[in-house]
Amino acid sequence: MQLLNFGLLLLPFVAGDLAPQPEPLLAGPSDVVPGQYIVTLKEGLTSAQIRDHKKWVSSVHRANLEGFAAGASGVETEGIMKHFHIHDLNMYSGGFDEKTVEDLSRNPYVKSVHPDQHVYLAKTVTQRQARWGLGYMSSKGKPVPLHSTLVDYSYDDKAGEGVWAYVLDTGINVNHVEFEGRAILGHNAIPNKPHTDEFGHGTYVAGIIAGKTYGVAKKANVVSAKAFDTGSSTYNYILETYDWIVRNITDSNRKNKAVINLSISGAKYQPFDDAVEKAFKAGIATVVAAGNDGKDAKNNTPASSPNAITVGAVRWENTRPSFSNYGKIVDIWAPGELIKSCWKGGNNATSTQSGTSAASPHVAGLVAYLMSTENLPSPSAVTARVLNLTIPNLVKDAKDSPNRVVYNGIQERKFTLPKYF
């Protein structure tokens, strides 16, 4: 049985000190949602076979509740809850007794049965301004002496126009002045909760992608896809939200003009890695955080999904913060310590945070930016272009990771550009 502790990846900061080290993301029995499961079906099943399978599940579950599991209660009595269809991947969540789980694991249509997992948010603390990260995007990784150093940010004025960034997170304050009306509410998977951001993380991430002051792609649209609320979630909600995003991108004909950001990480969980991989095969790019364990990211989800763009965090002087995960699965390094962006609590609120949650949206913003300035026909082309622009061999203590930092390619362009101060 695989266990997961899954978190959004921002870390607290104390003025005058380096960012404190995060608590390791540890998995344990308390992470499992008792009686609740994610069932992955084998590929190639027809709609009729899936329909018949669900009828079989309902019949077996009902019989088990009346017989073997007569004492079952709570979520175990729910049966099938939600179905997820991502490209050709079919999964469903449900509440089942142990006997039904045993029956499911032996069913010829079932690939795997995993316990659903709790998903936890990381602690955050408000801190003063830091704007070095944007300047880093256009400076070819030029280090600065202090995180408070202001650096010019040069960029093509298309700046993500016409592109959609989907933020699977805690929601977004779409009325924040930084978004200038370019943020919209998409999907809210959390029952009986408003589609607002009470935690701040999603608004912060969206601001790095597309805020008018703090954003990489200052004209991109951002879509709030809420799978977290105030501290925890489960794959039941995360998969529902990711499924909605993939469907919305596909139905809106936005595959070459959309990017998904996942500033989340936890122990390896194959069903969600599979979902990210299927989205890639469907023609959709996903950018993910490497994680804040200070360990090899190959053991984290969704960082370990083979065709996600996995992002580690770098400091202003080109060192790897000790919290950032590393390893061969990390594709690129981006600013991730003392980064200022939008926040909860008001339409002008800001916060300065650290973590690979901040690094990932820098690259998601770059993807949106490049989609608006270049004709990138597929997620493979997106990844190739992002990596082709990187500057090599700058990160100190990158361990065995590919050593390449993010760059937007602006210095090679031959026309007058606006500047951000």
Swiss-Prot record:
CDD domains: Peptidases_S8_PCSK9_ProteinaseK_like
One Gene Ontology cellular component annotation held by this UniProt entry: extracellular region
Glycoprotein found in the keyword field: yes
Cited Gene3D superfamilies: Peptidase S8 propeptide/proteinase inhibitor I9, Peptidase S8/S53 domain
Official protein name in the record: Subtilisin-like protease 2
Glycosylation positions in this chain: 248, 261, 348, 388
Lineage: Eukaryota, Fungi, Dikarya, Ascomycota, Pezizomycotina
Gene: SUB2
Localisation: Secreted
Domain Peptidase S8 positions: 131-421
Source organism: Trichophyton equinum
Superkingdom of origin organism: Eukaryota
Active site (catalytic residues): 169, 201, 357
Alphabetical list of InterPro entries matching this protein: PCSK9_ProteinaseK-like, Peptidase_S8/S53_dom, Peptidase_S8/S53_dom_sf, Peptidase_S8_Asp-AS, Peptidase_S8_His-AS, Peptidase_S8_Ser-AS, Peptidase_S8_subtilisin-like, Peptidase_S8_subtilisin-rel
